């Protein structure tokens, strides 16, 4: 799988831009704050339907303009696809998004999933091991949603029910019968989320362990462990019943705190290397090796589930890795289309790949 071409209009700091890409490596060079990451963001947007940097589509429209357009042409093993996303300004604080896939209107973002497979690796991802649990949950949600529309739908329904329950908990004179409506929904969708996360993290751990062993020369053993907020049961129905009972048991606490304390929105994952929890006791080098292993495992898992090689976006991450980790990353990525942003041309990268295109970006313009 690879992206052949992109067109931008009024996207971030770009007026109009049209680029044709290499199937192999695309180096995007430029000083800081010139628009390199904006270009990766545009590519990512057409794959996932949303930005990896902001939850506000309005931020994607160039200042003083009323609309932004991103269009890509992508080639898969058996067919080609086009995705066009238009964002229109509605007043000062809101916007409207329109998506077309192969010239047909898309009404739900989930309809884009599995169309263009993509993995983003940025300096922020290197902090995932030591960051707060919310960042690790977002990582799991983002990657699992991309290969499992069922997970995306279950998670979306869970979040909607959670928001409604939490909103109601902030009111006075709560009615147990109304809370029960949300408890039923949270139990159902929460059980689905937990079971899908469990299987995904197990497989992710297996791939990560193999990669981590290769990076460290078999000196370290990595385990990624799922830490659910509730006990995991044998069957989906048992899990649903258990979450429902736990929600009932926590009602007094939740009503006092005006927040839901039970469910997968409080899950976490741990990174254990040689029986040591890297979240609290890992060195920066160990934490970065875990993060790199995790990202490369994503690519392997996507390949297993879809039989496609995902596109990899490397956003100013090469300079954050030492020479050995850079070498391992480059050697592993021979079958993937790469987009690499950097401030300086790395001769090592240039020498490693046969087909490479270099783009120089200055203030949203190709030079």
Language-model-detected regions and their locations in the chain:
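Structural recognition of the conserved hydrophobic beta-strand(s) that form the central parallel beta-sheet
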Residues: 72, 337-344
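Walker B catalytic acidic pair
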Residues: 315-317
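Conserved NTPase motor "head" modules and their coupling/switch loops across ABC/AAA+ ATPases, GTPases
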Residues: 1-31, 178-188, 192-311, 320, ...
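Post-Walker A helix-loop "phosphate-sensing" segment adjacent to the P-loop in P-loop NTPases
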Residues: 45-57, 297-305
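An accessory alpha-helical subdomain
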Residues: 127-217, 227
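Conserved lysine of the Walker
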Residues: 36
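Nucleotide-state sensing region of NTPase/ATPase domains
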Residues: 48-127, 133-135, 144-147, 151, ...
């Amino acid at each position: 799988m690879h992206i052949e071409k992109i067109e931008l209009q009024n996207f971030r700091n770009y007026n109009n831009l049209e680029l044709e890409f290499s199937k192999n490596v695309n180096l995007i060079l430029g000083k800081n704050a010139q628009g390199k990451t904006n270009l990766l963001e545009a590519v990512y947007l057409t794959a996932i339907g949303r930005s990896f940097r902001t939850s506000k589509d309005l931020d994607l429209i160039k200042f003083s303009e009323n609309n932004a357009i991103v269009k890509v042409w992508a080639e898969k093993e058996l067919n080609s696809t086009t995705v066009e996303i238009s964002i229109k300004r509605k007043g000062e604080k809101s916007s409207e998004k329109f998506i077309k896939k192969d010239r047909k209107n898309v009404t739900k973002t989930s309809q884009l999933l599995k169309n263009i497979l993509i993995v983003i690796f940025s300096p922020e991802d290197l902090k995932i091991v030591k960051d707060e649990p919310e960042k690790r949950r977002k990582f799991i949600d983002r990657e699992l949603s991309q290969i499992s529309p069922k997970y995306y739908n279950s998670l979306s329904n869970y979040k909607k029910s959670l928001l409604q329950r939490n909103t109601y908990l902030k009111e006075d004179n709560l009615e147990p019968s109304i809370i029960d409506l949300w408890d039923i929904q949270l139990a159902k969708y929460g059980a689905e989320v937990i079971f899908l996360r469990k299987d995904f993290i197990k497989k992710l751990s297996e791939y990560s362990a193999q990669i981590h062993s290769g990076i460290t020369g078999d000196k370290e053993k990595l385990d990624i462990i799922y830490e659910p907020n509730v006990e995991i049961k044998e069957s989906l129905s048992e899990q649903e019943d258990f979450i429902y009972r736990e929600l009932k048991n926590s009602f007094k606490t939740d009503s006092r705190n005006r927040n839901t304390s039970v469910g997968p929105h409080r899950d976490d994952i741990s990174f254990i290397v040689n029986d040591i929890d890297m979240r609290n006791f890992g060195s920066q080098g160990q934490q970065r090796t875990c993060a790199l292993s995790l990202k490369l495992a994503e690519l392997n898992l996507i390949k297993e589930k879809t039989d496609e090689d995902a596109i990899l976006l490397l956003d100013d991450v090469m300079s954050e890795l030492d020479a050995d980790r850079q070498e391992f990353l480059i050697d592993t990525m021979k079958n993937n289309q790469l987009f690499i942003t950097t401030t300086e041309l790395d001769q090592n990268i240039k020498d490693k790949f046969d087909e490479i295109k270099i783009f120089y970006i200055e203030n949203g313009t190709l030079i």
